């Protein structure tokens, strides 16, 4: 059963301005430690950062919490599998929080077009184990 849907759109030009103004400090505020190396190797860092921020914001909307403890920018990371499909990884107290809320599977879709980065998140309820 779907228990949450979240969508976020980010203006990539705004991210580009923030990167120009604050540099790596801005990226460090948005990215989890596991994402920072990929960011540094990215050929389009403004798009990379915009997609990551949109995904994290969309997750917080799907949960209905906003970005506040334990749903924080550093507690959420995004990586892609070998086919390019993005997926979340959760860190710190966030996995226990999600389990307590009975969140099971999560789905993430990222897209970008004409200066906008977009993310959509769908959360499913955990399925009870049969004995």
Feature names for model-found ranges:
Residues 1-131:
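Core catalytic alpha/beta fold that binds nucleotide/phospho-ligands
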